Amino acid sequence: MTLINKLKQHLSDSQITQAQLAREAGVNAGALSAYLNDNYKGNIADVEAKLAAYLEKKAVQAREFVEAPAFIETATSRQIFKTLEFAQIANCLATVYGMSGVGKTKAIQEFAKSHANVWLVTASPSRSSLSEILYEIALELGISDAPRRKGTLSRLIARKIKGTEGLLIVDEADHLPYEALEELRIMQEEAGIGLVLVGNDKVYTRMKGGISPSHEYARLWSRVAKNTSIQKTKKADTQAVAQAWGLETDEEALKVMQSITETGGGLRILTQTYACRNGSKRIWQVD
């Protein structure tokens, strides 16, 4: 089969668009279209090398990797759902914090997808200042022409979310400075929505310092209605993942899975390990 026929077969089987294939292969979309129609006039050898490499990569992925389920409901995800539901219903401030790799982000993403008026933004080193996190929220709300002035932007967001009975979730909230947290707290109270800060232990420990009335976080701490700590992967989480992958009766696999989830990174490492299982029903042991 010629390379052109292989590419056409791949497009048909995978339902991928030509534009997406071109992006992933690193070739110009027009060049790909011309090549598939056998009338490309440019450097054919260069284009064919990139397209052949693309097909080889896809073959390796299909042979060596297994696509994990988009979402697996676990005991931990249900615990997080309860906190999110509470914050939205009670229009209050809550936190979800703890070890990385235990499923916090997957849970909040699933909740945001399946509930109305739930907005999820992610903070980062470059998106942690007050103006940047407000801009992220504006984009999440569909305000594409959002102004960059902090005061104007904050008032615009507050008007947009007021009366919605909604929920704002900020992932990686440990990146946010005091100024940004205070602004979100005031906005949450004025708009009458729920606000959940998600991240590592710093999300909680910083605000807990506010237990002292003289501490700068005192106003924040006094308004936190619920703190949910997740410090390790639950055994029930591992069992739920095993069941989703059809391994619940494989005692050897269950033991290895449990040992993996007991390390830092927990479910994330387990998912990556299973994805690389070489097409077999065997979990790799990780040193």
Swiss-Prot record:
<keyword id="KW-0067">ATP-binding</keyword>
<dbReference type="GO" id="GO:0016887">
    <property type="term" value="F:ATP hydrolysis activity"/>
</dbReference>
<dbReference type="InterPro" id="IPR052026">
    <property type="entry name" value="ExeA_AAA_ATPase_DNA-bind"/>
</dbReference>
<protein>
    <recommendedName>
        <fullName>Mu-like prophage FluMu DNA transposition protein B</fullName>
    </recommendedName>
</protein>
<keyword id="KW-0229">DNA integration</keyword>
<dbReference type="InterPro" id="IPR001387">
    <property type="entry name" value="Cro/C1-type_HTH"/>
</dbReference>
<dbReference type="GO" id="GO:0005524">
    <property type="term" value="F:ATP binding"/>
</dbReference>
<dbReference type="Pfam" id="PF09077">
    <property type="entry name" value="Phage-MuB_C"/>
</dbReference>
<keyword id="KW-0238">DNA-binding</keyword>
<comment type="function">
    <text>This protein is a non-specific DNA-binding and ATP-hydrolyzing protein essential for bacteriophage integration and replication.</text>
</comment>
<dbReference type="GO" id="GO:0006313">
    <property type="term" value="P:DNA transposition"/>
</dbReference>
<feature type="DNA-binding region" description="H-T-H motif">
    <location>
        <begin position="18"/>
        <end position="37"/>
    </location>
</feature>
<dbReference type="InterPro" id="IPR009084">
    <property type="entry name" value="B_transpositn_C"/>
</dbReference>
<keyword id="KW-0235">DNA replication</keyword>
<dbReference type="GO" id="GO:0006260">
    <property type="term" value="P:DNA replication"/>
</dbReference>
<dbReference type="InterPro" id="IPR010982">
    <property type="entry name" value="Lambda_DNA-bd_dom_sf"/>
</dbReference>
<dbReference type="InterPro" id="IPR049945">
    <property type="entry name" value="AAA_22"/>
</dbReference>
<dbReference type="GO" id="GO:0015074">
    <property type="term" value="P:DNA integration"/>
</dbReference>
<dbReference type="Pfam" id="PF13401">
    <property type="entry name" value="AAA_22"/>
</dbReference>
<dbReference type="InterPro" id="IPR027417">
    <property type="entry name" value="P-loop_NTPase"/>
</dbReference>
<dbReference type="InterPro" id="IPR036733">
    <property type="entry name" value="B_transposit_C_sf"/>
</dbReference>
<keyword id="KW-0547">Nucleotide-binding</keyword>
<feature type="domain" description="HTH cro/C1-type">
    <location>
        <begin position="7"/>
        <end position="62"/>
    </location>
</feature>
<dbReference type="GO" id="GO:0003677">
    <property type="term" value="F:DNA binding"/>
</dbReference>
<feature type="binding site">
    <location>
        <begin position="98"/>
        <end position="105"/>
    </location>
    <ligand>
        <name>ATP</name>
    </ligand>
</feature>
<keyword id="KW-0815">Transposition</keyword>
